[in-house]
A protein has these predicted regions:
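Metal-dependent nuclease catalytic cores that hydrolyze phosphodiester bonds in DNA/RNA
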Residues: 1-130
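Mg2+/Mn2+-dependent nuclease catalytic core
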Residues: 114-166
Length: 166
């Protein structure tokens, strides 16, 4: 895996507007891809999440959500530092778990990454939307936008359709 700074990615500041994530890119405040996708969720998906929250209770649902967010952030930090050739030593429980999960991605996914154009890249379509992705480059011979996802268990294909749209 080699670096090729083929593109200059814009800098951006993330901000909340009406409690929705937006990116300040140049002179534009653009809604995030995640914000747009959450606004287009099916009623079925929203109801499934609401049903799960009722089943486990609001306190447990919030705990699961926060743990997943913390774990995902730690995983992304570890992978970002790895890709940049920097080390990250986080001896907290979350950090140790993130390192374990990151090593799976490093061993099984990153060997097929041939070229890196950017890490933590802001991408946008002027006037419409913006987002940040973990990597841009050549993966398995194809130009690729790569976004790492954290999960404690395998996901069924029908549950991750938004990942592909993202």
């Amino acid at each position: 895996m080699k670096w090729n700074k083929k593109y200059k990615y814009p800098k951006s500041i993330r901000e909340l507007i009406n409690n929705k994530r937006h990116y300040d890119v140049g002179e534009e405040k653009l809604p995030s891809v995640t914000t747009i996708l959450s606004g287009t969720e099916s009623d079925e998906k929203r109801e499934a999440i609401a049903k799960w929250k009722r089943r486990v209770g609001s306190v447990e649902a919030e705990s699961v959500k926060n743990k997943a967010a913390t774990s995902g952030t730690a995983l992304h930090s570890y992978l970002e530092k790895y890709i940049l050739g920097e080390g990250l030593l986080d001896l907290t429980d979350e950090g140790v778990e993130a390192e374990r999960m990151a090593k799976v991605i490093i061993e099984k996914g990153l060997p097929d990454l041939e070229e890196i154009w950017g890490s933590e890249c802001v991408l946008h379509y002027p006037g419409l939307y913006a987002g940040a992705t973990d990597l841009c480059g050549i993966y398995q011979g194809r130009e690729s936008i790569i976004d790492f996802k954290q999960s404690n268990k395998p996901k069924r294909e029908e549950y991750i359709g938004d990942y592909y749209l993202q």
